[in-house]
Amino acid sequence: MINCKLINFDCAQELVSVCRRYDEDIDVICGRYIIDGKSTLGVASLVGNHVSIEINTEDG
């Protein structure tokens, strides 16, 4: 799990761009919300917050 802060929309857009390069499911977690890391609108809704990034692989 990786922790970071989404400072602005450009950071959110860059995170989505990186997530889309991978086939695995990537979740962006903020409190009780779990957002698909490949969703621009979803990740953009978390701008200004500290988030955790979790990569879900078949290995667990």
Q: At which residue positions do the language-model features occur?
A:
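C-terminal structural segments of small proteins and small subunits
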Residues: H50-G60
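Amphipathic alpha-helical interaction surfaces in cytosolic regulatory modules
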Residues: C11-R20, E24, Y33-N49
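Short amphipathic
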Residues: M1-L6
